[in-house]
Amino acid sequence: LYRPRGDGAAQDGSNTWSQVSKLADRIAHERALRDNVCIGEVRVTSPARTLVDCALLYPFEHVLSMFDSALRRGLVTREEIVAVCDGLRVDCGPVFRLLHYADARSENGGESFCRAVSIEEGFVPPQLQHTFYSRVTGKEAGRVDFIWHTEDGRIIVLEFDGMQKYIDPEMTSNRDVRQVVRDERQREQDLKEAGVSVVIRTNYIEVVQRAPFVMKLMQAGVPRAGAHPIFEHAD
């Protein structure tokens, strides 16, 4: 044991806890400054620091899209995000969870949100953006948002539909809603002929409500995390 002197130093010449704390605060402050960047005359946080801050403030399902998008656009690397965490004196568990599930192949925020909710509800993370080909002609049968393989050999596909696909002329190619629906059904048939067992369709409202979305996944037999360890990590 030792008694601190009035100047803050211990009698044995070592630093007191007060000095150590001040030093740590200074290091953290200097690290925070390095995490800032200037755009013109405006100082903003770097992409990596912004992602970390959001991960620590907001729910997983609302932040996964940010991580997916930043990785897809090449705004940040996983190593940069980890480096920010190394300089903080807080529990960065939520950040590392997001890094574990983040995937640059996710093409939009709706898909990321859908995937995040499925993970939160205990389902195995799906593979993303898989293309199927006809077993007969070899031609492309369709590119799907999400895919799961089950232990019994079934292939489950999930399509996340935004309302824009039915009303936006750029997405409908000027087809009316009835034609879009007919083409959608034909696409599902093509996918099944290419080996898909089940095609699930969902939308933003169902995912927000959760119960209808979860029921569809359960009825289709989407594997649960922990039940089939070899399928817990999407390729």
Predicted regions and their residues:
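Surface segments flanking catalytic/ligand-binding clefts of nucleic-acid enzymes
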Residues: L71-D235
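Phosphate-handling catalytic interfaces
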Residues: L1-R115, V124-P125
